[in-house]
Amino acid sequence: MIKKFLVAILSGVMITSLVSCSASNNKKVDESNMAAKSSITENEEASFIGEGEWATDYTREEVTTLNEEITARMEEVCNFLGLEYIKEEKIKEENSESVNDKYIYFDNLNPEPNKIESMYYGFKTYGSNMAKGNLNLKIGLKLDLDQIKNEEKFDLKETSISNFSEAMTNDIERDYTEINEKIIDIVKNQNSNGTIETNLNGLVETITIKDEFLLYRLDSKMYDFKK
């Protein structure tokens, strides 16, 4: 079950909630429930392998502009798919450090095969002076294991992951053939800890498969705004 390996996206001690809205209504979200929702393992200190345009030493203003553009595209995808989502800005504590987190999030309880269980996209800045920051996309997808094992069929492009991934990269021409083959191979060979890591023009894409769920991450470098 995805709850066993996806740790709460919105974990940490929330100090202040600054902004909150929904795509289709103004329904309030129970904060205690949100903290318990499925989410994605954090490993912000992992070594960064990306090379490319996104690995540029962007300024805070440049990353802020990129985040605004990406967030707008993420909202367009949510609206197109008819998904209710949360858009918030929070200040919280992570590892004894103040973190400002601007994010868009939704979850889908009991998803059908090849459907998203949860999605988070956010721009985090760290420290009281917000001297560094990064962009992160995290998605949990329930796999159709029978289809993959029996028919050797899986296409990431046909899932909503591609919509959100392309909203971040702004690249709609990607060929998913190689990544699909790797995912099928992991499932067929029952590699319980199978992980695929790819550089997408300076963003690091990480796909981890555990049981019947696929965990998708797309991370920018940690930008140093003091440079």
Task: Name every feature range the model reports, one short phrase each.
Residues 81-126, 173-209:
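A cross-family detector of function-defining hotspots
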Residues 7-8, 12, 22-105:
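N-terminal, intrinsically disordered, polar/charged segments of Gram-positive cell-envelope systems
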Residues 110-111, 133, 141, 189-190, ...:
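Structured, amphipathic secondary-structure segments that form assembly/contact surfaces
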Residues 133-139, 194, 203, 214:
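Envelope-exposed proteins and targeting segments
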Residues 16-20:
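C-terminal motif of bacterial Sec signal peptides marking the signal peptidase cleavage site
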Residues 198-227:
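Short, charged interaction patches at domain edges and termini
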